[in-house]
Design a protein with these regions (language model features):
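Ordered, amphipathic secondary-structure segments that act as subunit-interaction surfaces
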Residues: 102-104
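A charged N-terminal "starter" segment
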Residues: 1-100, 118
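Active-site loop/helix belt of alpha/beta enzymes
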Residues: 4-6, 39-51, 110, 114-120, ...
Length: 206
């Protein structure tokens, strides 16, 4: 019996992507929006999606190579390396292409400190996701070593934001807000908290 193989086809509606982005902006009018386009915009085509989302305040990617491609395609907005940098070569490219860097661990912090590269840095805080980031207890020491010059802000990731019944989201928000209030961070530093679920389901906008 002959097998029939059908090729899967993805139809990308860029107008729909733009519409979705505009919905987020409307629901969070006082906040800046970072459009995450890692993994080739989840298979949608990072460069094309970034061009369509020209109103985004910044773009987030996982790897340096993704950021370089965006820059070389003409994207001028800030580009954030969500997984940070892990060796001197990546750090050098981050400097050349003016990329924002997220710090998750002490090894990354030591890399930046050893090379005096402390500009355009986010500090990731693990408030309950349990995946990446410094603990709440570690963060004050991280900021002390990093210094406040060039600190963009604190970042966390909501674990259950899409579940309106979850109490964990409120707990995570309370933890990072209390942490930020307790730290002597510059007024220019911001909090990056809400993913899409946080905006659409939880109505939380930072």
């Amino acid at each position: 019996m002959a097998s029939v193989s059908k090729q899967a086809t993805a139809i990308i509606d860029l107008d729909a992507i733009r519409h979705n982005f505009e919905q987020v902006k409307q629901r969070a009018p006082g906040s800046k929006v970072m459009a995450v386009v890692k993994a080739d915009a989840y298979g949608h085509g990072a460069s094309k999606v970034a061009q369509v989302l020209e109103a985004a305040d910044a773009f987030g990617v996982a790897r340096v190579s993704e950021a370089v491609k965006l820059r070389e395609s003409g994207i001028g907005q800030p580009i954030c390396l969500l997984e940070g940098v892990n060796d001197p070569e990546e750090l050098n490219l981050a400097s050349i292409y003016e990329l924002q860097v997220v710090l998750h661990n002490w090894e990354q912090l030591e890399l930046l400190a050893a090379r005096g590269a402390r500009r355009h840095v986010w500090v990731k805080v693990n408030t309950g996701m349990g995946r990446l980031g410094f603990s709440l207890e570690e963060t004050p020491s991280v900021l002390q070593k990093l210094g406040h010059q060039g600190l963009l802000g604190l970042m966390t990731h909501l674990a259950d934001a899409g579940d309106k019944r979850s109490v964990k989201t409120g707990q995570q928000i309370a933890r990072i807000t209390a942490l930020a209030d307790s730290l002597n961070v510059p007024g220019s530093a911001v909090l990056s908290i809400a993913n899409s679920g946080g905006v659409l389901a939880q109505h939380h906008y930072p």
